[in-house]
Amino acid sequence: MLTKRIIACLDVTGGRVVKGVNFVGLRDAGDPVAVAARYNAQGADELAFLDITATSDERDLILPIIEAVASQVFIPLTVGGGVRTQADVRRLLNAGADKVSFNSAAIADPQVIDTASAKYGAQCIVVAIDARRRSAEESRRITAGGRAIGPGWDVYSHGGRRNTGLDALAWAVEMQRRGAGEILLTSMDRDGTRIGFDLELTRAVSDAVGLPVIASGGVGTLDHLADGIQTGGADAVLAASIFHYGEYTVGQAKQHLAGRGIAVRR
């Protein structure tokens, strides 16, 4: 039986780990190197390092911090935020990343996923999708086919600041076609709220693609992690708040998932 993964997430800005609610109201959560080492020791299956303001600030990759984090962890490390080109993938892999996550750059130029995947392999290429449920007004938006787009989720770029108008399910399918190896799916509506994943969104994307889907956004209890897998169909679950402030350890999370009948790496 394939085990399900628990991924600890470091949202980084200004050289510090932070956590907000709905992508705003950021609260400090510590030094990224120290936090990464803690999750490595706790037995996290993977670590995600996301520079959440690199794109909006038009800033370069923070390679020294990434290298320092990579030196402290012996689990797969995914790095995202400010990744724009195939050359950036090479720079991050050389800095110690195992996978590289594209978001806004893939929206601006989807071909970058084709080229990066062809050169480095799909197993290295993650596409992050920040999705927000459409309002009633947005659901009436007319598509190129002349019909209302209807209920669903729009894809946002630039750290959740811009609505691209792309449909999240269609975008995930296109990213799979272009060579992505994994989808990191964040519900902007649930981010930091601690009320659980958007399970409808998670299930819809999981059913739409044949790729591993990482559920992100909204974890407040250990049951939420299990729900993301059992109800949402996710292959991995990502959390930040419940781990950052000492409420739970990764080990406790794995024990809880096992108690719910979910296979985890111990």
UniProtKB/Swiss-Prot annotation:
GO molecular function: imidazoleglycerol-phosphate synthase activity; lyase activity
EC number(s) reported in the record: 4.3.2.10
Residues annotated as the enzyme's active site: D11, D130
InterPro entries: Aldolase_TIM, His_biosynth, HisF, IGPS_HisA/HisF, RibuloseP-bd_barrel
Chief place of localization: cytoplasm
Pathway: Amino-acid biosynthesis; L-histidine biosynthesis; L-histidine from 5-phospho-alpha-D-ribose 1-diphosphate: step 5/9
Top-level enzyme category: lyase
Catalytic activity: 5-[(5-phospho-1-deoxy-D-ribulos-1-ylimino)methylamino]-1-(5-phospho-beta-D-ribosyl)imidazole-4-carboxamide + L-glutamine = D-erythro-1-(imidazol-4-yl)glycerol 3-phosphate + 5-amino-1-(5-phospho-beta-D-ribosyl)imidazole-4-carboxamide + L-glutamate + H(+)
Subcellular location: Cytoplasm
A GO BP entry: L-histidine biosynthetic process
Pfam families: His_biosynth
Top-level taxon: Bacteria
Gene Ontology annotations for the cellular component aspect, listed alphabetically: cytoplasm
Assembly information from the UniProt record: Heterodimer of HisH and HisF.
UniProt-listed PANTHER family: IMIDAZOLE GLYCEROL PHOSPHATE SYNTHASE HISHF, IMIDAZOLE GLYCEROL PHOSPHATE SYNTHASE SUBUNIT HISF/H IGP SYNTHASE SUBUNIT HISF/H
Protein purpose: IGPS catalyzes the conversion of PRFAR and glutamine to IGP, AICAR and glutamate. The HisF subunit catalyzes the cyclization activity that produces IGP and AICAR from PRFAR using the ammonia provided by the HisH subunit.
Family membership noted in the UniProt record: Belongs to the HisA/HisF family.
UniProt-recorded name of the protein: Imidazole glycerol phosphate synthase subunit HisF
Organism: Verminephrobacter eiseniae (strain EF01-2)
Top-level taxonomy: Bacteria, Pseudomonadati, Pseudomonadota, Betaproteobacteria, Burkholderiales
